[in-house]
Structures are given as C-alpha cells and as structure tokens.
C-alpha cells in the first residue's frame, strides 16, 4: 500500500469510526444519560461546546477556525513529508491520517451541530470521543516516531 493510500485510508477509517460511534450514542442515549449509572468506566452522552477539557466553551466559531487550520496543517505535513524523514514512512503517514481524522471528526460535529458529542468517561478524566482519541494517539505516535528516528540517527522503521 502506498503512503498516500495509508494516509487517506487512516483518515477515512478514523472519521467513519468517530461519526458512527457518535451516531449510535445520539440514537440510543439522551444527553446526560450514563451507562452504567456509576462506575470507573461509563458511556455518557455529553454535548461539548468547547475543546478538550471543555476549554473555550461557547466559542464554536473559533474552534471551527482552529479545526480548519488543523486540517490544513495535517494536509501540509503530508504533502511536505519528504522534508521530514520520520513522516515519510507508512507509520508516519498513518499517524498523520488519524490526526486528520480526529480533526475532521470534531469539525463535522461543530459545523453540523454547534457542539461535539462526547461519550467516553474513564474515572475523573473529562469525557471524550473517538476523534479526541485519534488526535491524542496520532500525536503520541508522531512524537515516538520522531524520537526514535532522531535518536537512532536514521529514519523510523518502515514497518513499525
């Protein structure tokens, strides 16, 4: 599979998983409902007008603009990846793809609904969704790829 295909398939699968999971939650749980009602792990239907940890709550226009910038940055990084060897690998473009997926997933919600649907609650950590998970895991993955390639003096492994 080419790097371009890895990037776009990663992004498409991430957006699909995010939007499908949010559709299932919205169709089956009213906002504020939790399953189970208490416990360390819950599925909770929450409307979040902010960003991570509900920062910038109520500033949807700014968050839409920031998300559009995020999409542009992810696409730019993909198209300029040859300048950063750790990005020009299948793992590098897959990580960029899931970052793009997370950005687009929440952007779709903000434009369509004016809020993001969050539903995963673990302990006292703020409620989040699949798009948030894509963003977080993609960024961690890119950092690890960068650290691995920088410390080894070469490119990140093509098959990592």
From Swiss-Prot:
Catalysed reactions, semicolon-separated: Release of signal peptides from bacterial membrane prolipoproteins. Hydrolyzes -Xaa-Yaa-Zaa-|-(S,diacylglyceryl)Cys-, in which Xaa is hydrophobic (preferably Leu), and Yaa (Ala or Ser) and Zaa (Gly or Ala) have small, neutral side chains
The keyword Ribosomal protein is assigned to this record: no
Keyword entries, A-Z: Aspartyl protease, Cell membrane, Hydrolase, Membrane, Protease, Transmembrane, Transmembrane helix
UniProt-annotated location(s): Cell membrane
Keyword Coiled coil: no
Gene Ontology terms describing biological process: proteolysis
Entry superkingdom: Bacteria
Annotated active site: 118, 132
Spans traversing the lipid bilayer: 60-80, 84-104, 127-147
GO-annotated cellular components: plasma membrane
HAMAP family assigned to the protein according to its UniProt record, in alphabetical order: LspA
PANTHER family: LIPOPROTEIN SIGNAL PEPTIDASE (PTHR33695:SF1)
Entry protein name: Lipoprotein signal peptidase
Gene: lspA
């Amino acid at each position: 599979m080419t790097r371009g295909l890895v990037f776009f398939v990663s992004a498409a699968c991430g957006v699909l998983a995010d939007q499908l999971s949010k559709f299932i939650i919205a169709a089956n749980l009213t906002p504020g409902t939790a399953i189970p009602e208490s416990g360390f792990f819950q599925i909770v239907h929450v409307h979040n007008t902010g960003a991570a940890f509900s920062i910038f709550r109520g500033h949807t226009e700014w968050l839409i603009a920031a998300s559009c910038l995020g999409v542009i940055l992810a696409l730019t990084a993909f198209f300029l990846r040859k300048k950063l060897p750790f990005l020009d690998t299948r793992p590098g473009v897959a990580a960029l793809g899931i970052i793009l997926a997370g950005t687009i997933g929440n952007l779709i919600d903000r434009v369509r609904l004016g809020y993001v649907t969050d539903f995963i609650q673990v302990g006292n950590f703020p409620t989040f969704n699949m798009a948030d998970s894509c963003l977080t895991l993609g960024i961690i993955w890119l950092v690890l790829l960068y650290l691995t390639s920088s410390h080894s003096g070469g490119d990140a492994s093509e098959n990592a």
